[in-house]
Curated annotation (Swiss-Prot):
<keyword id="KW-0663">Pyridoxal phosphate</keyword>
<dbReference type="GO" id="GO:0005829">
    <property type="term" value="C:cytosol"/>
</dbReference>
<dbReference type="InterPro" id="IPR021196">
    <property type="entry name" value="PdxT/SNO_CS"/>
</dbReference>
<dbReference type="GO" id="GO:1903600">
    <property type="term" value="C:glutaminase complex"/>
</dbReference>
<dbReference type="Pfam" id="PF01174">
    <property type="entry name" value="SNO"/>
</dbReference>
<protein>
    <recommendedName>
        <fullName>Pyridoxal 5'-phosphate synthase subunit PdxT</fullName>
        <ecNumber>4.3.3.6</ecNumber>
        <ecNumber>3.5.1.2</ecNumber>
    </recommendedName>
</protein>
<dbReference type="GO" id="GO:0004359">
    <property type="term" value="F:glutaminase activity"/>
</dbReference>
<comment type="function">
    <text>Catalyzes the hydrolysis of glutamine to glutamate and ammonia as part of the biosynthesis of pyridoxal 5'-phosphate. The resulting ammonia molecule is channeled to the active site of PdxS.</text>
</comment>
<keyword id="KW-0456">Lyase</keyword>
<dbReference type="InterPro" id="IPR029062">
    <property type="entry name" value="Class_I_gatase-like"/>
</dbReference>
<feature type="active site" description="Nucleophile">
    <location>
        <position position="78"/>
    </location>
</feature>
<dbReference type="InterPro" id="IPR002161">
    <property type="entry name" value="PdxT/SNO"/>
</dbReference>
<dbReference type="GO" id="GO:0008614">
    <property type="term" value="P:pyridoxine metabolic process"/>
</dbReference>
<feature type="active site" description="Charge relay system">
    <location>
        <position position="172"/>
    </location>
</feature>
<feature type="binding site">
    <location>
        <position position="105"/>
    </location>
    <ligand>
        <name>L-glutamine</name>
    </ligand>
</feature>
<keyword id="KW-0378">Hydrolase</keyword>
<dbReference type="GO" id="GO:0042823">
    <property type="term" value="P:pyridoxal phosphate biosynthetic process"/>
</dbReference>
Amino acid sequence: MKIGVLGVQGDVREHVEALHKLGVETLIVKLPEQLDMVDGLILPGGESTTMIRILKEMDMDEKLVERINNGLPVFATCAGVILLAKRIENYSQEKLGVLDITVERNAYGRQVESFETFVEIPAVGKDPFRAIFIRAPRIVETGKNVEILATYDYDPVLVKEGNILACTFHPELTDDLRLHRYFLEMVK
C-alpha cells in the first residue's frame, strides 16, 4: 500500500511522519501523473486558496476530481476539507466540489484564536481525541449521504462520505495516530 500526501503546500511533512510511524510507504504528490501511483491520498491543512491555485496551475485539479470520483480514498484535514467541499459559505473560491458539505472558512477565528480541545470519535475508540483547531473551517451543512463521525459544540468536525474522510482539525499535529489508522483501513 502506498499513500500519497498532496505536496503543493501545508502540513505535508507532519502527515508523512504519521504514516511512517504506521509503517506505510508514502509519496509526496506534486505531479498529476503521481495520482495514479497511490492507493490513497491525504490533502493536508494549509491555505486553501493557495492550494487550489497551485492545483489548477499544474493541471492537477481535474485529474484529482476524476480519481476521487473513481473511488480513490481521500483523507482531508482543515484546508483540505475546504478544497473538497461542494459549497463555501460567504466566500467566492474555486474548489474541487466532491464532498457534499457546506463549509465556512476560518469559522473559529484567526490564527491567534486557535485552540485545542478533546472530541469523542466512537469510530476510533472510546478515548477522547485531542483536536487542534487552527483557522479551521466549520461544516455548516451536510448532505444526506454524509456520515458525521465527530462533533464539537454541535458542529460536525469529522465526516465521511463514501471514499472521503474529512476532518476540520489537525490530527497530524498530535501523536495520536488513530485517524490515520482509520483512513488506512478505508484504503485496504
